[in-house]
Amino acid sequence: MSKVSGSNGGDSKNTLYCSFCGKSQHEVRKLIAGPTVFICDECVELCMDIIREENKTSMVKSRDGVPTPQEIIKVLDEYVIGQQQAKRILSVAVHNHYKRLAHAAKSSDVELAKSNIMLVGPTGCGKTYLAQTLARIIDVPFTMADATTLTEAGYVGEDVENIILKLLQAADYNVERAQRGIVYIDEVDKISRKSDNPSITRDVSGEGVQQALLKIMEGTVASVPPQGGRKHPQQEFLQVDTTNILFICGGAFAGLDKIISARGEKTSIGFGATVRAPEDRRVGEVLRELEPEDLVKFGLIPEFIGRLPVLATLEDLDEDALIQILSEPKNALVKQYQRLFEMEDVELNFHEDALREIARRAIVRKTGARGLRSIMEKILLDTMFELPTLEGVREVVISEEVVKGTARPLYIYSERSEEKTNVSA
């Protein structure tokens, strides 16, 4: 196939048009010629999106109608960079959970218990995003709760039944669908016991919340009002069985690496023991050695940890991983901003050293991947403010100096590029 791109001048009779959307060669970046038809770059991208969606829906399923672990991890790889071990653990756990539900109707002497999941990793390493992506792959209702807002029933704050209410809302009040959903509880490290010593003051937002979560995580019939909380006691309650709801808990657990290291030091005493200074090891490397007893020392009660038998630890993201996150996934930040600029018919490009500088700044802020968007917003703010009123801008280039704040983005105008083409010709 030959590639046809025309200049803005010339006879309109010679202007070529896309056979699919009808746009002229001047309205698109590229026009590709076939034997009798033309297709523009925008239609090619649209076709690719349709094919990707169809591939996702025609995902290979196991005999139980549940996506296989290999298929789950394949889709996760498209959206989440790195964290291979965590993705492997999650794909197996989710596959087994929904396989268990597929066989629940069949009579068996062996009752398969539910395996809820605990995700442990630094801030911004992808815990929440992994849980959201899993729910999309399996196509089940998903809701997220912040553990810091939860309190025991009867106290000011959100009670745990509100989590089930949110899931029901995500399922459009379809109780059957809600009972097969996924609940992600974030910041569970913030509900650790405040102290090992008993106190006359009740710990309603720490151990009290852990106790309240035990029942719904293990499986109970929760009475949920359709329209929110404890404020309308006269309303008819909906009965939601939480037995088959998959609970995924996540937290950064700041300081947990020190507890693990201290335990490791006790076990590595003696001749021939390899000793590495704690400061030589990254947080993610230390977290790989996590045991349930470490979470007990951190402040989670043993009964709560017992309801979360699958432990997955995530690595802290280094510079290279953050650069990949910026540019490689399907909905990478760079691609998102490029799409925004395309709406103004402007091409946005980043130098490699600019992406590296953005990654460095996120590491300094200690916000992981979560901090990348705020950095990008700051860099592109003035450009996005000016662009709608500027005429003739064809391309915007972001260099390392722009990220550092020592230079402005480079604007390339279509008139200039045409003049250069005419001169060289």
From Swiss-Prot:
Pfam families: AAA_2 (PF07724), ClpB_D2-small (PF10431), zf-C4_ClpX (PF06689). Signal peptide: none annotated. InterPro entries: AAA+_ATPase (IPR003593), ATP-dep_Clp_protease_ClpX (IPR050052), ATPase_AAA_core (IPR003959), Clp_ATPase_C (IPR019489), Clp_protease_ATP-bd_su_ClpX (IPR004487), ClpX_bact (IPR046425), P-loop_NTPase (IPR027417), Znf_CppX_C4 (IPR010603). GO terms for cellular component: HslUV protease complex. One of its GO terms (biological process) is cell division. The keyword Metal-binding applies. GO terms for molecular function: ATP binding; ATP hydrolysis activity; ATP-dependent protein folding chaperone; protein dimerization activity; unfolded protein binding; zinc ion binding. Keywords: ATP-binding, Chaperone, Metal-binding, Nucleotide-binding, Zinc. ATP binds at residues 122-129. Zn(2+) binds at residues 18, 21, 40, 43. Residues 6-59 form the ClpX-type ZB domain. Belongs to the ClpX chaperone family. ATP-dependent specificity component of the Clp protease. It directs the protease to specific substrates. Can perform chaperone functions in the absence of ClpP. NCBIfam families: clpX (TIGR00382), PRK05342.1 (NF003745). Component of the ClpX-ClpP complex. Forms a hexameric ring that, in the presence of ATP, binds to fourteen ClpP subunits assembled into a disk-like structure with a central cavity, resembling the structure of eukaryotic proteasomes. This is ATP-dependent Clp protease ATP-binding subunit ClpX.
